[in-house]
């Protein structure tokens, strides 16, 4: 029996976003006061991300007969991430040169007040490659979960799952226990998801109330250029990759519409991570690939953030009248390829990553970030949407490379829209096992 339209989650979230926009615009003070609703929802999701990643990765790896497969899946995922991320950086750079969103501002960097961006610049210091890699290793097993660091949790999960796989039948009872615990946490996800409209309403009301629609006007060309470029990237680059893998990017986007609306409302791709992992399993991807690729992608495969970084750098250069040589632009690309790996799927991380990039590229003044601070929240929504679509496509592609993609199920789900709330994770788990 079909649900009434007003009971469908994505309809509720879309309605909540619209109400949030209206409240924030006409009653900004009240809109700003709604911030705890959005923050509370994101904290609820973050509360269970660690256990879900742990359970999914551990049960997936423990079920592998060949431990070499873990390294093979990880290697293929990182190769894909690097190639597609480089494409995203180049496309952002090219679009900024082609559409020139910063030309005509003629701003003297010395006149800019950098107090507003001081907190971002301070957070960006010290993000070297070595420190980033060392940070992946937690101080203790429990500190990884206490800090909620996705990569640290993933590392612990990899070791734990590999140990269970080596122990084999002797650890079977532990694997079965973790599988049952996983079902409990995914049930919690479904409960939390029911309040997603409230979270989306609060986050959107705060964004519009604090920054106002009027803050968009002076920089509409930059916003339009970024959104247009992101759409082209998704439809052309990711669309081509999807078509080569055997599915339609448009149908895939329609399939994850609920997750996209949650991301749109909260500006955080992390808010949809647990539900996204579940959806990808239902789509036909194996549990082991989903568990490895999705969490890793939240630091290594942020396509929207990559497009934003190179575009923002060129925008600041254009707005301040700085001419960049080819070598300087190649340097920016090289630096961005490293600093982008330190980003995560949370609100504002893209701006911090931009600060880290500019901090090691002295040609362009860090003070120029002031120009886009007011609109970053609106850019964050597009970054997060592009990121989550990119990670979803990456998971399907790696599953196909590993021959662990149920293509019949993939075609059936995308064709008929199966796998929504009526499906259960248990069914997906039985198929993956």
Curated annotation (Swiss-Prot):
Q: Which PROSITE patterns match?
A: NA_DICARBOXYL_SYMP_1, NA_DICARBOXYL_SYMP_2
Question: Membrane spanning segments where?
Answer: 8-28, 44-64, 78-98, 148-168, 188-208, 222-242, 307-327, 355-375
- One GO biological process term: L-aspartate transmembrane transport
Keywords linked to the UniProt accession: Cell inner membrane, Cell membrane, Membrane, Symport, Transmembrane, Transmembrane helix, Transport
Q: Which GO terms describe its molecular function?
A: fumarate transmembrane transporter activity; malate:proton symporter activity; succinate transmembrane transporter activity
Which HAMAP family does the UniProt record give? C4_dicarb_transport
Task: Supply the PANTHER family for this chain.
Answer: AEROBIC C4-DICARBOXYLATE TRANSPORT PROTEIN, PROTON/GLUTAMATE-ASPARTATE SYMPORTER
The record's function comment reads: Responsible for the transport of dicarboxylates such as succinate, fumarate, and malate from the periplasm across the membrane.
User: Which protein, by its recorded name, is this?
Assistant: C4-dicarboxylate transport protein
């Amino acid at each position: 029996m079909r649900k009434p339209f007003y009971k469908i989650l994505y309809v509720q979230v879309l309605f909540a976003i619209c109400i949030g926009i209206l409240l924030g615009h006409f009653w900004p003070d009240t809109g700003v006061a709604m911030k705890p609703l959005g923050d509370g929802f994101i904290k609820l999701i973050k509360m269970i991300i660690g256990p879900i990643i742990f359970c999914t990765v551990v049960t997936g790896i423990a079920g592998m007969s060949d431990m070499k497969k873990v390294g093979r899946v990880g290697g293929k995922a990182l190769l894909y991430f690097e190639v597609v991320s480089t494409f995203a950086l180049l496309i952002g750079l090219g679009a900024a040169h082609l559409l020139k969103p910063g030309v005509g501002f003629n701003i003297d960097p010395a006149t800019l007040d950098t107090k507003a961006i001081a907190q971002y610049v301070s957070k960006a210091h010290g993000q070297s490659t070595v420190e980033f890699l060392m940070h992946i290793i937690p101080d203790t097993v429990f500190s990884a979960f206490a800090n909620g660091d996705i990569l640290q949790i993933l590392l612990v999960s990899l070791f734990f799952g590999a140990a269970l796989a080596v122990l084999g039948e002797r650890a079977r009872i532990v694997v079965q226990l973790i599988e049952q615990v996983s079902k409990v946490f995914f049930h919690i996800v479904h409960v939390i998801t029911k309040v997603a409209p409230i979270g989306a309403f609060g986050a959107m009301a705060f964004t519009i109330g604090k920054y106002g629609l009027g803050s968009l006007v002076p920089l509409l060309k930059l916003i339009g250029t970024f959104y247009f470029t992101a759409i082209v990237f998704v439809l052309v680059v990711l669309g081509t990759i999807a078509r080569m893998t055997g599915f339609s990017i448009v149908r895939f986007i329609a399939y994850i519409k609920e997750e996209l609306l949650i991301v749109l409302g909260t500006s955080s791709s992390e808010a949809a991570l647990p539900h996204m992992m579940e959806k990808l399993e239902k789509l036909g991807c194996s549990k082991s690939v989903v568990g490895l690729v999705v969490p890793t992608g939240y630091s290594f495969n942020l396509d929207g953030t990559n497009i934003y970084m190179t575009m923002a750098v060129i925008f600041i250069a254009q707005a301040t009248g700085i001419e960049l040589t080819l070598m300087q632009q190649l340097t920016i690309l090289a630096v961005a390829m490293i600093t982008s790996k330190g980003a995560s799927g949370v609100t504002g991380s893209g701006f911090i990553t931009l600060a880290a990039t500019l901090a090691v590229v002295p040609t362009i003044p860090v003070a120029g970030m002031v120009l886009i601070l007011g609109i970053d929240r609106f850019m964050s929504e597009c970054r997060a949407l592009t990121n989550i679509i990119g990670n979803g496509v990456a998971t399907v592609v790696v599953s196909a490379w590993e021959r662990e993609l149920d293509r019949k199920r993939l075609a059936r789900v995308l064709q008929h829209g199966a796998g929504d709330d009526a499906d259960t994770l248990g069914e997906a788990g039985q198929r993956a096992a």
